[in-house]
Amino acid sequence: MASAAAASPSLSLNPTSHFQHQTSLVTWLKPPPSSALFRRKTLPFFERHSLPISASSSSSSSSSTSLSVHEKPISNSVHFHGNLIESFENQDSSYAGTIKGASLIEELENPVERNGLSGRRRLFMQDPPWISALFLKGLSKMVDQTLKIERKDIDKRKFDSLRRRQVKEETEAWERMVDEYRDLEKEMCEKNLAPNLPYVKHMFLGWFQPLKDVIEREQKLQKNKSKKVRAAYAPHIELLPADKMAVIVMHKMMGLVMSGHEDGCIQVVQAAVSIGIAIEQEVRIHNFLKRTRKNNAGDSQEELKEKQLLRKRVNSLIRRKRIIDALKVVKSEGTKPWGRATQAKLGSRLLELLIEAAYVQPPLTQSGDSIPEFRPAFRHRFKTVTKYPGSKLVRRYGVIECDSLLLAGLDKSAKHMLIPYVPMLVPPKRWKGYDKGGYLFLPSYIMRTHGSKKQQDALKDISHKTAHRVFEALDTLGNTKWRVNRNILDVVERLWADGGNIAGLVNREDVPIPEKPSSEDPEELQSWKWSARKANKINRERHSLRCDVELKLSVARKMKDEEGFYYPHNLDFRGRAYPMHPHLNHLSSDLCRGTLEFAEGRPLGKSGLHWLKIHLANLYAGGVEKLSHDARLAFVENHLDDIMDSAENPIHGKRWWLKAEDPFQCLAACVILTQALKSPSPYSVISHLPIHQDGSCNGLQHYAALGRDSFEAAAVNLVAGEKPADVYSEISRRVHEIMKKDSSKDPESNPTAALAKILITQVDRKLVKQTVMTSVYGVTYVGAREQIKRRLEEKGVITDERMLFAAACYSAKVTLAALGEIFEAARAIMSWLGDCAKIIASDNHPVRWITPLGLPVVQPYCRSERHLIRTSLQVLALQREGNTVDVRKQRTAFPPNFVHSLDGTHMMMTAVACREAGLNFAGVHDSYWTHACDVDTMNRILREKFVELYNTPILEDLLQSFQESYPNLVFPPVPKRGDFDLKEVLKSQYFFN
């Protein structure tokens, strides 16, 4: 025992360890008496070296324990709460070392003599429970005011540093890129480094100088012309240095190429306006920076004084965190907005110069005897498309076409693209108005209005008091701190490096294009054309998907070493919230969701471990998510070996996680569950994983609450049940019944009988799910037909194209009929909403309404007016909002848009209430996320807010607002409600689950 005590077991601070605990038989000390004295002691484990700890116990107990603890350097703000312990993980050691005042509570009692040795007091990192309680509940009360002030100062310095970085990210991105190309040019000349550059960098470097030269030439040309003969874009092309303008044009153009244009063509009007907008934004920042830079020799004394005062004012505002006021100073330096016509004219000329300057070179032959070939990287041409096959109505528009060599190399090096709207290092500005909030300097608007002036005017007119709850909700979503899950990112990178084509990742290789047959046989040639067309289509789709993956990964790589980051949110015109950053965000694919986690960690607790297991079962899916909670827990217990193998050996193990519907999210859940189960104190394990609670066909849930129909409410889990009700299975069962009945009819008199016989074995939940899901959002017969046709193609039973089309038509009609039978009340409300919209639109008014949170919504569907702009490249037709509303679109879009505004309202109400309850919250429309330990609290809140929302007379208020706004129009009465008691929702465990 003496030797054991002398050995002094230590804490192994290995950053990559995952709570690997080595335990021996131990007798825990009793909790200290409440009267015990305590003193503070500096935490040596913040210094990243081993801390020797040996056991002190009663004379009857002489066991010792050795623990290997996952290192957790100090985080941004170290506060210990009853249900919260900040994550110490993945922080810079330099910052960890600055925390000198962090405290450890040590009992001041006489040390126990054991075999002549003075035993040291023990530090318990996980057990026993009273120690956990001490750390999680009592520690914050024992930190004195001096220590709090010291930490506050540290946090302030750190925050100021992050804020300065954020300002640089937003204002100097293009400047840094220009400097990089200059440095690359210099290195290429001095060290011949060009062959080692990534494809995109090599390509941009080859374009940079020629494009810069032609822009400089154009600037001089326009400057020397008289005002009468100068081009319309002349005053604006001179506003930036040529090198910066060249970088913006290159990156914006390539960004458009990588944004999903499958055929490698971008519409001229889209490219021109996009470039024009980027130039205008940079001009505003450039003018301000230029005005406040160091003194010029020709400056008068007054000008020098003005510059100095302006610089001091802005620096002072930024230091005092008054970013909004600083931004106002910057904005005051600008001019009036340019407008689409100006943006298009300047953008078109810069596009023309890019086409002139940018070339690509095919690989040289082995012999090297042939003359190097250079081809234009971009070509301007006109494209003609028909509305549908066989139609005489054609549309002709200009496009910029990318060379195939450019497309081939682009998707392998997309990570070198500049992405301006990256996640923020500091919390976003609070929303206070239409354009007041979000990013610090980049243009931010509370709503994506897509040019609808009526919607913009409605938003600009609202007061902060009217829509303060909407602003609060967006601030809540924007203040949720995220970080990159490095474990999952590492797995993604390895799979991607190996060629993808697994876990939902696209194949990094193209499919081979079949060679043209030597035969002149027409049928053989036709077959080859069809095969080649199909292969080219697949390759274009793969190119687009590869670019998308690379853009997501490039952001993840950029942010992986950050302690945390934030996503400013804004709204679509219906009131649904979205992150403003477009690539790596939690509304995106399984890849993104698996790669992201909360920056703040919280202990699992008993409830959290329970919900973690259910969450894992939901992610695995395959029908498991439709079982009862007990059955899902049993599923996880039965696959614990697979789960642990997935966590410990995801690449070379059994790969059970790859069978999940959401593989990367499933793997992330496997990792944290394995950590918990291997810990001697699983409830104390810190989890950063967001746990989801999803609505059950949420659109129908909202309709059921509006109509108070008991049958429909039960079908979508507004009523408690032993297991989740599955509306998709119910619809598929009804479709099967109808088809079975049709199949018994005479095929001579009933053509659908033959189709019914074929389809009766094809009907399942998956066949009808998408149509049922989108029915409440206004899916048409044509939309339903296309959805079902895709599912039938996947099954592969019907291969004949004509038969497939006929089967899809029949299935769509039967599915929509079954929906109408089961959801009569919902259909009645949809029809009433559509009728009201038609009445309003027929009087040439767009449909307007106010959401329960005070957000004004205006449907933007008007007949567009074409505005022709003559540019140096071609005549551009800019679409702008007309004065005549589109009656058909106003009518068909109102029911789904209205329900979307209600589900957005429910999510925002829940977000604010969760924040007030101390929860971290993220929302994905009808999927609400929080820490595992807080799921029970969030579940209670989201149910209470749903009942609160629908206890208001929503349809009656809507009708009253229509009658007040349009007193000369006559509207039908609100459909009758059923007798469903909304309070039943509070007791339904599968309402969201």
Swiss-Prot record:
GO CC annotation, single: mitochondrion
Targeting signal (transit peptide) range: 1-95
Catalytic residues, chain numbering: 694, 769, 926
Null mutant phenotype: Reduced plant growth, impaired lateral root formation, rounded and pale-green leaves, protruding leaf laminae, irregular leaf margins and reduced seed sets.
UniProt keyword annotation of Transmembrane present: no
EC number(s) on file: 2.7.7.6
Pfam family, one: RNA_pol
Subcellular location: Plastid, Chloroplast
Keyword terms of this UniProt record: Chloroplast, DNA-directed RNA polymerase, Nucleotidyltransferase, Plastid, Transcription, Transferase, Transit peptide
InterPro entries according to UniProt: DNA-dir_RNA_pol_helix_hairp_sf, DNA-dir_Rpol_C_phage-type, DNA-dir_Rpol_phage-type, DNA/RNA_pol_sf, RNA_POL_N_sf, RPOL_N
Reaction catalysis annotation: RNA(n) + a ribonucleoside 5'-triphosphate = RNA(n+1) + diphosphate
Enzyme class at the top of the EC tree: transferase
GO biological process: DNA-templated transcription
Keyword Plastid: yes
Single Gene Ontology MF annotation: DNA binding
Top-level taxon: Eukaryota
Function as written in the Swiss-Prot or TrEMBL entry: Nuclear-encoded DNA-dependent RNA polymerase that catalyzes the transcription of DNA into RNA in chloroplasts using the four ribonucleoside triphosphates as substrates. Required for chloroplast development and leaf mesophyll cell proliferation.
Entry-linked PANTHER family: DNA-DIRECTED RNA POLYMERASE 3, CHLOROPLASTIC (PTHR10102:SF1), DNA-DIRECTED RNA POLYMERASE, MITOCHONDRIAL (PTHR10102)
Family according to the record: Belongs to the phage and mitochondrial RNA polymerase family.
Name of the featured protein: DNA-directed RNA polymerase 3, chloroplastic
Lineage, highest ranks first: Eukaryota, Viridiplantae, Streptophyta, Embryophyta, Tracheophyta
